[in-house]
């Protein structure tokens, strides 16, 4: 069984560095990371946002959204959440 809670907690603690890696054209605006969505031809940052306190994310231009860092990792990688959780756990040195 994958411990999504543990992986998400570790990811939230590391979110600033994860977001800088995953969305390098983004920037912090208050408690959010604002970037272009790399999954579509997004020309201007603004509609794709990640709450750095909770890990919730949304692309307000497409209504795609998720509630935690694992779902963001899955979305960005185009994989399922289980695969993304395992990869994220490995990256963070957390037992899945």
Language model feature labels by segment:
Residues 1-96:
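N-terminal structured subdomain of primase-like DNA metabolism proteins
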């Amino acid at each position: 069984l994958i411990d999504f809670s543990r992986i998400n907690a570790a990811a939230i603690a590391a979110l600033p560095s994860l977001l800088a890696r995953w969305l390098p054209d983004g920037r912090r605006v208050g408690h959010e990371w604002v970037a272009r969505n790399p999954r579509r031809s997004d020309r201007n940052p603004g509609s794709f946002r990640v709450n750095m306190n909770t890990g919730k994310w949304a692309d307000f231009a497409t209504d795609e959204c998720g509630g935690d860092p694992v779902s963001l990792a899955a979305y960005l990688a185009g994989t399922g959440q289980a695969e993304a959780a395992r990869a994220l756990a490995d990256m963070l040195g957390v037992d899945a």
